[in-house]
Amino acid sequence: MRTSQYLLSTQKETPADAEVISHQLMLRAGMIRKLASGLYTWLPTGVRVLKKVENIVREEMNNAGAIEVSMPVVQPADLWQESGRWEQYGPELLRFVDRGERPFVLGPTHEEVITDLIRGEINSYKQLPLNFFQIQTKFRDELRPRFGVMRAREFLMKDAYSFHTTQESLQETYDAMYTAYSKIFSRMDLNFRAVLADTGSIGGSASHEFQVLAESGEDDIVFSTGSDYAANIEFAEALAPTEPRAPATEELRIVDTPNAKTIAELVEQFKLPIEKTVKTLLVHAHEESGHKLVALLVRGDHDLNEIKAEKLPQVAKPLTFASEEEIRAAIGAGPGSLGPVNLSLPVIADRSVAVMSDFGAGANIDGKHYFGINWERDLALPLVADLRNVVEGDISPDGKGTLQIKRGIEVGHIFQLGTKYSEAMKATVQGEDGRNQVMTMGCYGIGVSRVVAAAIEQNHDDRGIIWPDAIAPFQVAILPMNMHKSFRVKELAEELYTTLRSHGIDVILDDRKERPGVMFADMELIGVPHNIVIGDRNLDSEEVEYKNRRVGEKQMIKTSEIVEFLLSQIKR
């Protein structure tokens, strides 16, 4: 590719509305342009990277035995009603009607469509297992699209779906997809971790996320110092404290706290250790519990894990916090004065709260708190459950080592769905015994466009992007100095350009009439890994300058050896 025949579209200034570095650099490098909130046009440089990611994903899916299909973005609403997700999915599902008043959705995912397809095509256990994949546009009507293509409304995704008659068969394909995903992200030279995860709205029994480690990540990823345990913080179990509850040393007393409506204010004003305080959070109760609200207790320095809380049978799904109006109607006090003593609601305490003694909490009277609270003296010990997020230093759930926490960007997710969709949609095959059997399913997703942004978050400096070779828009940039004035510079540049292309190398020849500084800045910004500078002075000694974008080192290479040298440097 020649820059004179290419839309480079680089920008010097950082757009004011771009929050994260990947969004800033994708705009400045001319990879994307915003069309509307959460909607982006991909420009040539962006498309080149996107296609590189797609090709790696497609190759490894094929290597793993998956079969490519293509399903419509527009899906009939009746499939979503049949699966039960029409009501469950919420406002992220964009719903519309056609001219015949028939309801449809823009697909955020394709479980319903593939299940509908396979139930009409597969009728015998002898045809299974099968694994189908596509690389397709998805749409989720995000409330607040942000971070560029990281959390866009329209995005490109690889989704795969497998069908089985046994759990053992599903496990084999799940393991094969786990291996394929590891190969995909390794080929892209990404620093990633596969972590245990919650199944979320997709459903199912087992799940792993593939997280690219980056400070800008939205997810907290938990690692053990003593084993290979790794999990999303939403999934990681907080073990019960091993130390028994200390005996009571204080009397229960009620204290006026008119200006302490938060844990932080209580700790500041009364010099109470934060680990001696309890937060009382009221959420809507499950309708079968016979109550409107249920109280959840976590230690003052801990955060409620809403995923864990929502799984409790006493809690309504989706988890919804009580409004101040609902709290006052039920308790007679505001949210800043709630506590477990004399509380006329069902109470569930976190494991760490259950071993506390001499602690403080609201008195269920505005402007008052109880101090010196002790279980089984001042109130009965309630139901106990794991309700909190783990923190650094906690014992690992597998009992080996302690936990560390890092930030991650989710780029892939694999699920063992079981029979959630196939049972709801009556997707059956004839089993070995001649009886109809519901198929067992797995699903496996990769955010293709998100991978591009995640790679930038891991690979950049103050001059621009530093692409890994495998997904760079161009592997080599040829930068001829004053080629329009020097015949021998132009001759070598053209010869090198032709030779590298014949070896299958993606190369860009900067043949613009631009100053060297502009040429260097643009190639650094778009992240070309290998750069060759051809100048008249160096040609006197039959040399060119090679610069590696990642390490920044410059080398003088003989013109007769440059092709062989580049082929040895490029990871292919």
UniProtKB/Swiss-Prot annotation:
Top-level taxon in the UniProt lineage: Bacteria
GO molecular function, one term: ATP binding
SUPFAM superfamilies: Class II aaRS ABD-related, Class II aaRS and biotin synthetases, YbaK/ProRS associated domain
UniProt-listed Enzyme Commission number(s): 6.1.1.15
Keyword field: Aminoacyl-tRNA synthetase, ATP-binding, Cytoplasm, Ligase, Nucleotide-binding, Protein biosynthesis
Main location: cytoplasm
Function: Catalyzes the attachment of proline to tRNA(Pro) in a two-step reaction: proline is first activated by ATP to form Pro-AMP and then transferred to the acceptor end of tRNA(Pro). As ProRS can inadvertently accommodate and process non-cognate amino acids such as alanine and cysteine, to avoid such errors it has two additional distinct editing activities against alanine. One activity is designated as 'pretransfer' editing and involves the tRNA(Pro)-independent hydrolysis of activated Ala-AMP.
Domain notes: Consists of three domains: the N-terminal catalytic domain, the editing domain and the C-terminal anticodon-binding domain.
Family statement drawn from the similarity comment of this UniProt entry: Belongs to the class-II aminoacyl-tRNA synthetase family. ProS type 1 subfamily.
Protein name in UniProt: Proline--tRNA ligase
Organism listed in the record: Yersinia pseudotuberculosis serotype IB (strain PB1/+)
